[in-house]
């Protein structure tokens, strides 16, 4: 449960940083280079946190692979035009799916994911390995 709470808080922090950068720069459209690329990296960071939230026992490396492939899949879907059409109707869908394909985004997703994989691998994964998979099913030594 602690890992899931930490992942949820991390995702909220990444969203806060993204919105804060847009507020500071005044670039709410995301068209400027800072808003666009930081937003792409922070989106990928939120996806990584989402992977940990859904599957807290997954290794850092696999969480990174899953998050990167998810981001690349969403980016590739933008080539179909479907995300753009859905985004025109809802700002939350626009934030989640984007509007148009950008090769630079393909490179910026790992920028948001790789540092989290390293931190997870060095600091959290060793702790995660010593925790019981299901505390309620772990035999108790209490009488």
Model-derived segments and spans:
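Bulky hydrophobic segments
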Residues: 1-131
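Short, intrinsically disordered terminal tails adjacent to the first/last structured region
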Residues: 130-143
């Amino acid at each position: 449960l602690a890992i899931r709470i930490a992942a949820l808080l991390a995702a909220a922090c990444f969203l806060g940083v993204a919105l804060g950068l847009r507020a500071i720069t005044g670039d709410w459209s995301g068209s400027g280079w800072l808003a666009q690329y930081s937003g792409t990296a922070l989106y990928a960071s939120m996806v990584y946190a989402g992977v940990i939230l859904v599957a807290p026992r997954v290794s850092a490396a696999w969480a990174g692979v899953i998050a990167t492939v998810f981001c690349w899949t969403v980016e590739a879907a933008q080539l179909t035009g479907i995300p753009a059409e859905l985004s025109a109707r809802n700002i939350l869908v626009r934030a989640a799916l984007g509007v148009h394909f950008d090769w630079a985004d393909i490179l910026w997703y790992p920028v948001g994911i790789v540092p989290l994989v390293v931190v997870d691998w060095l600091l959290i994964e060793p702790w995660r390995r010593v925790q019981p998979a299901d505390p309620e099913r772990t035999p108790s030594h209490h009488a």
